[in-house]
């Protein structure tokens, strides 16, 4: 189905509607699964030696020093323009402001007299950030990951990226307080972070996007007892736009294409109650496509994308919640009025001037978001992902005495005799003291 095909949602059967909201298939082939498993085992067994072999094989690079030196990072900084450095500084300031505001106050309550319960937070001790390489280095992801890690107080923050690492990535790492950067990419980088090597430290949790091999490596290490936790399940990027008749077609088209250019497996969807808006957006997409260097990539993504006309804005919200987009852009008059009805979305952008690019780079929200329908159960990345919660309880003699019979009754009902005995022993001790 062509992206220029305008679909009337209410003329479709329930099955056709379900098909319209299906995402491009993603599944690691058996060969990818096996290859990644072999890489993990090899890196775990042979450490740095295996990393160097994989760099030569996959990156066509001979890596002498896996760890990037301070001199190399300083030199990279010198090569960047002041304009880019200033732009990064503005982005980091906004990311800091938003993520600092996410700090949770400690919980300290007395659930009944003499029974004190607390909840406190502690940072994840060590985290590893994976940043893909390639022709368009994702240095903005360094800002999005390293900044909350620093605010959370993670003691060890390291970064891996395929060699040669772009100057922008090295500077962003330094700017955000990353302690060590390593010349290693792909599934082998995930293995190094999960298991540790002579050079790369083992970390508790791994963050960051990547290709099918990286994604599969993260999945596998998260399921190994000796592996590491990961940030969230990954899938192709996506955006859904809700637009009314007052939206600007060129704005809508530019936001759709911003997502489509990410990759051929990206998906974009327009929902609008105005058929004329759908037609004008389709025309604007074609005009803007002609000017894009990544037009072919975007065009492939558009093959799995949709222009859907609905009954009204309420139905747009209903369909959006069913789909659960990574990015949801609401270009309607009084866009904020629709927010209370949104139940599943990674990040929401309100109004004509809240373009997705702002969230991707510099508004302050995090651009690491659940995709592929995981918005139903997962949240956008935030400070909490770099922290863990811990509870504390303290019972006084009086508090224990008041709760003792309740605990005994519950333990006896579950036939956990040792649990009940732990109470009874203390009750008897108090009687003896009296």
From Swiss-Prot:
Pathway named in the protein's UniProt entry: Amino-acid biosynthesis; L-histidine biosynthesis; L-histidine from 5-phospho-alpha-D-ribose 1-diphosphate: step 9/9
One GO process term, biological-process aspect: L-histidine biosynthetic process
Reaction it catalyzes: L-histidinol + 2 NAD(+) + H2O = L-histidine + 2 NADH + 3 H(+)
SUPFAM superfamilies, A to Z: ALDH-like
Active site: 326 (proton acceptor), 327 (proton acceptor)
Binding-site residues, Zn(2+): 259, 262, 360, 419
Needed cofactors: Zn(2+)
Zinc recorded as keyword: yes
Gene3D superfamilies linked to this entry: 1.20.5.1300, Nitrogenase molybdenum iron protein domain
EC number: 1.1.1.23
Keywords of the record: Amino-acid biosynthesis, Histidine biosynthesis, Metal-binding, NAD, Oxidoreductase, Zinc
Top-level taxonomic group: Bacteria
Co-factor binding comment: Binds 1 zinc ion per subunit.
Positions of substrate binding: 237, 259, 262, 327, 360, 414, 419
GO CC, any one term: cytosol
Record's keyword annotation contains Amino-acid biosynthesis: yes
Residues the record lists as binding NAD(+): 130, 188, 211
Gene Ontology molecular-function annotations: histidinol dehydrogenase activity; NAD binding; zinc ion binding
Record Pfam families: Histidinol_dh
Its biological purpose: Catalyzes the sequential NAD-dependent oxidations of L-histidinol to L-histidinaldehyde and then to L-histidine.
Protein family: Belongs to the histidinol dehydrogenase family.
Subunit structure: Homodimer.
Listed HAMAP family: HisD
Protein name: Histidinol dehydrogenase
Organism: Shigella boydii serotype 4 (strain Sb227)
